[in-house]
Curated annotation (Swiss-Prot):
Its cofactor is pyridoxal 5'-phosphate. The gene is dsdA. The keyword Lyase applies. It comes from Hahella chejuensis (strain KCTC 2396). Its EC number is 4.3.1.18. Gene3D superfamilies: 3.40.50.1100. Keywords: Lyase, Pyridoxal phosphate. The lineage of its organism: Bacteria, Pseudomonadati, Pseudomonadota, Gammaproteobacteria, Oceanospirillales. This is Probable D-serine dehydratase. NCBIfam families: D_Ser_am_lyase, PRK02991.1. It catalyses: D-serine = pyruvate + NH4(+). One of its GO terms (biological process) is D-serine catabolic process. InterPro entries: D_Ser_am_lyase, Ser/Thr_Dehydratase, TrpB-like_PALP, TrpB-like_PALP_sf. It is an enzyme of class 4 (lyase).
Amino acid sequence: MNPLSIAQDELKAIQSSQPIVWLNRNYQNPASAPATPNVDALYAAEARLKRFAPLLQRLFPELEPSHGLIESSLIQADRLNNRINPVGGLLFLKADHDLPVAGSVKARGGIHEVLCFAESLALTHGVLKDVDSDYCTLASQSARDLFSKHTITVGSTGNLGLSIGVIGSALGFKTVVHMSSDAKEWKMERLRKRGVRVVEHDADYGAALEAGRLETIADPCGYFVDDERSPNLFMGYAVAAKRLQAQLEALNIKVDADHPLFVYLPAGVGGAPGGITYGLKHIFNDHVHCFFAEPVQSPCMLLGMAGAPGAAPTSIYELDLKNRTDADGLAVGAASQWVCDATRNLLSGVYTATDEQLYQQLYLLKDLENIEVEPSAAIGCLGPAMLTSEAGQKYLDSHRLSHRMENSVHIPWLTGGSFVPDEEYQRYLAKAVNVST
């Protein structure tokens, strides 16, 4: 096992599946992030999504109100704030659980990745003359004929596969999704109805990912969406920070030294929270404080961020953890090394939570704000209370934030839920009521 920047008592807590708050010793240390991407790629992704907006509006009528941009609301949640935030300030919910087209944060990175591939093919084969062309041309039969010769493959616990499958099939690509044993049946069925080939694995996310990778290697017209090391996915997520900046400005919400912003991001393999963190830190610098949130059984990003730069992340299985959690989107055994090496200096810390705690937050979201999410999305709501822990107080004190908390802003990132079938959600809610009352 690689040397980890984790204290002995923290390690014992992790091994015994106890919730902890881990502060990143490499925060603000650029040397700890040898793979930091060029920020130009963020602006290129933002521009690409704008170029594709007319096409996306044509393919997905639900995007008409946003003129083809896939974006979610920022919801002020005062009732929830009164219940879950003991440190003061305002609470907003980033409603990616309700993102159109794919119903989760994965719509950001997954759709951008497929659009990158489609754009490259179209430019290479003359379907698009240049990036100033009419991108609605990509809905033509000639474009679909081109795309149908290629197969897009991805490994997933559920939501990334859903986003890749939806956009890939809409453009005319053959699409294959390798699903881990954690994946929900309704997600697989939704993909099959769109003509996507779903391969089920009786193993974890890592095995599904590797199977997809191997299948693509054998296909000369194959394209693999690599959730572990894809800059295109990463930058699709990073664009969310630009959109959030505009939403905060529209609400006259300041983010500066006297008005710190705290963002709480559910983390699986790391691409989505890593990309969002990268974008937020580029825009708000030291005035934003990003924390990842993971199940106690699957703290892969904690172990990855605590590892040495350039080293393969430690697997949760090396600590005898079982990766068993109802937060299926976060059930990952080992973090993305590339994401860790791209963002290690940007992350404030990681906290972990039990499934029972997730269900308690799921209940509060429904009871107080009438918001329905899947269990993995609820973990961000534990963020404000996390700051009252010994480690949380240490963080606030060391960054001279304690006296500024009355002016702080807190944003749990709700990552998925709107596509969950009602009977599945009712099962979640029944469990949530049971542990909350």
